[in-house]
Every structure is written in C-alpha cells, then in structure tokens.
Amino acid sequence: GTVRVFLDSPDNLLFQGKAEDFFRKPVEILSGDSSLGKHTESFYQYDASYFPIPFSKGFRMEWTGKISDIHFYHVGLRLYDNDQEVESFTRENFRKYKATMIRTDSLLRNPDHRPASGHYSSMNGEVRLEPGEQAVLMDLKGPSSITRFSLRADAGNLENALRQAVLRIWFDDSETAQVNAPLGDFFGAAPGINPYISLPFTVLTDGTMICRFEMPFSKNARIIIENHSAEKIKVSAEAIVARFRWKDGESMHFHALWSMDHDLTTSELDSRASDIPCLAAEGKGRIAGAAALIHNPSGVPTSWGNWWGEGDEKIFIDRDTFPSFFGTGSEDYFNYSWSSSRIFSYPYCGQPRNDGPGNRGYVSDFRWHISDDIPFRESACFLMELKHHGKVEGFSYGRIIYYYLLPGGNTVTGLFTAHDLREINYEPWMPEAFKGSDGWRFVQAEELARGNDRVSFEKDDFWAGSGVLNWIPASGQDVLKLNIPSDKEIRETRIGITLTHTPDSGSLTFRLNGEPVRFSGRDTLLVFTAAGRLLDNHFSGPVRLKKGSNELMIGMPGADGRKTAQIDFIWLRK
C-alpha cells in the first residue's frame, strides 16, 4: 500500500509514497541522499526503523491499498507534557544535524568507543566459589553510578555454571536485590556464551560479558555471586564507577528481574494462549528492555511447525483496563518477523542463539527500550502470551525485564528454586513431519555414509538421533559420498539436507549421480557462522532420482584438514 504522513497540520505533507519505503528507509527517502543512508544503517534494525521524526502539534498517517493484502505496521509514538518544547521535523534537519546523525550511528555500532567523560574510577573484583558457596564480588560507596559492568566466569561446564550461578545486586540497603538473575541470563543471551553486540549489552567470544545500563545509587551497592551449581566457579569483574548527583524523588534504581517456567505444555494455534507474567511493578519507573530465554523441544524441523512465538506482548501502564501495548506476535515485539531462525544482533534487538532447525532448541531474543523506553507513574504489568504452532510438552520459558524504579516502589518477585535453575539439558529427538515438514521422511546421515577415513560420528543430543556425521576433508580433492535410496524412479523431486553451521564449517558443493546440484539456490553452499552452532535446512532445486541407489557427492573447495562438514539428516519426499 501507500502512506501519507502529515506533521502538525493537514497542509504539511511530509511523505507520500510506498509504505515499505517509509518504514524501511526513511533517511534515504526523506533526505534524497543515499550516501547518508549508508552512514546511518544502525537506525534500521532488522524489521524496525528507529529514525526519529519529532512533531510539535500533531501527527497523522493515512494508508491506502487493498485491505486483503495488508499485513500490519507498528508505529511508536512518544508524547511529551504540554510544557515540553519540541522542534518539528523538516527536511532541513538532514543538513543541520548530519554530523550528529553520523556520530550517533558510530556510537550505536561501537558502544565501547565513546570517550569517557567526567570523574570515574575502575573497580575490580574476583571470587572463587565451591558448589553451594556465595561471596561478595564488590562493595561500592555512593553517591555514584556504575556506568559499565563487565564480568567473566570460568568453570568446567560453563553452560551450566552460567545458569546456576546467580548475580544479585543490592542498591542503598534495599531489603531485596534489585538485580536478581542467573549470571549468564542477566546478559540476555543464555544459555552459554553466545557472542553479540548491542548498545546496553555485549558478549564477546572470549566469554567476557558487558553491561552498560547505568546503575546509580545514593549510599552503597553490593554485588554478590551465589553458586548453586555442582561446578567450581571463578568470576572476575570490573565496574567503571562515575560520580553521580543523586536526587531524591527523581533518581531511580536499576532493576533486572528474572523468572523461569519449566515443563510447560504449549497451546496450539487453534486453542487459547496462556499469558506468561514478566513484570508486575508498583511505583514510578521506566521499562528499559526485555529478553526471552526459551527451550523449545519440538521435534518438527521447520519454523512452520515449531514456531513458539505466535503470542502477543501485553503491557498495562498505570490504570489501564486494556493494554497500552498489544502486539501482533512475539517476533514482532523483538523486531523481526516470520519466525526468523537467523542469528543476528543490532543496537536495540537481537537473537544471539537459535539452535534450530527452524526455531527449535534453545533460543534467546532481546529488545532494549532505549529511545522508546516505557514510562509509568503508578504501575506496570508486562505479560507475554505463549502460543505455539503445535502441542509441545516440556517447554521452558525464561524471561528477564530490565527497568528503573523510584525508591519506595514495589515489584512482585519470586524466589529462585533449584528447579528454576536446573541444569541445561539436551533431550533426544527425531524430526517429525508436521506443517512445514509434512510430506517428507528423514534419514540420518550416519546411515547413508560410504567408507571414508575422514568421517567420524559425534554423539550429542543437540542433533537428531543423538548424533551427527562429521567430515574433515584433507584437501579440496576429497569427496564425501552418501547413498540416497529410492524405491522407484522419480523424474522430478527435491531433497533436503540439515547441516550444522559453526565457525569451523567449510563451504560445500554437491553432485547427484554426477550432475551438479544447487542447494538453497547456490552452487557453493556457505555454512559458516561467526560463533556458536546452529542447525539449518537447505533444499535442492529439482533433481531426478533413479530406482535404487543414488550417489550424493559432497565437496569442500579449499579444504585444508581443519574445516568441517557436519551433516545431521537428509530429507526425502514421501
């Protein structure tokens, strides 16, 4: 469709044109300067644009098109008190504020490159904890503010340790900890170390985790680590502490509230969704972000079938009887769409972990409310619906809400139990034919491999059938041969292959019965990912299968004995 956008009066038409142009690239469209768009790319974050358009009197948007074709758009508005002066946007702003826009873009891309200002100091702490122990990591005196908090943990099983060691921070002798979350979950990318860069949080490949949310306090701050795991844990941390002028009645404490529900049974598309409580706070404050930490043990290997996020966010502010924020699906809240299985991160949103294939396994999503923080004067209630494409038992829904609250406010909090902090488990699974995978049958790659001294079989419940075929070719001349069976000749069909994407994965080529085959539309399939591991599905173009044995020959151009190919299973049409 098309949209028309008016600022302040019906005579002031700011834009008229394609809706997609306005929502996806307003800088290029409104400025007419494509080069400026390249210097402000961080304003566009997956399916969301964060380019601000201020107005002093009024805003009007009209959409024209076929109702049957429209999906939906989200438009976020921030309204100020009447005595607040606002300069309405004009195209002249691009010339006037060009340098500021470019600097802002640079800061969003590289949040640790901003110059330090004012009086600050670096405080360091280190603790070594036996199972069941707790220790004070830092004791800080105020009035001050933690402007950057970085932490690194070492343990034998780090994934479990980061879930079962708890970070608690008390500000100004509070009866309850304002920050109360598992060590890894606090940084928004659990379980384990899942590298990403955003404005308030970063996780580095070496395991360093960084928080840049400002944490002011008037008198003191105490940071404690509790070890509920069976691991010995070493935790090292640094806090950058700046002078802060605390103002009673204005200054707020930072809060991070974590909660977890295990062993849920998800509702299907045609059944009623259940609401997952994320936050219930009383007092004056601002919501600054949210993260979802999911375990989705569905056996369906496609997003259309294993997608967990059809539920909507509902955020009630103050005396709302109907939510001020009522979403259109969990992925839309997290700024992506169509149940994306990509690993990605932006300044305000990201998905640093998604095991796959599709959206199964462990998943972490986050959204930070920085330029769109959500203020409340009396109360805030944040609910997220859980609605799945299918019925799944053993589902886990963890979440953490980040917010600021004026001292004297209250938050409904629950104490952690050993069950909440249980170990990270990978349960055996097999691919199921349902919705997007309906009409397919699946064969484990281990059953199809022919003799090859560069092949091994790795056991782990991360993969279907509790194992994966691991091939490490010595050179680009090596090939891996898989035997694809067919009980009849099929003149035209497709085959699929589910591969593990890792930092050590090589690029792959394919030939079926001697003929080149393209997978995912590519002659050479790229299966590299910068960090971690994920399973992804790739499908061939049209191929012909003969009755009996069909040879799928896989090559790895440029192989050097270090790059790997990990093949989980093959898809064949029923």
What is the meaning of each model-derived region?
Residues 1-432, 499:
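Beta-strand-centric surfaces of beta-sandwich/beta-rich domains
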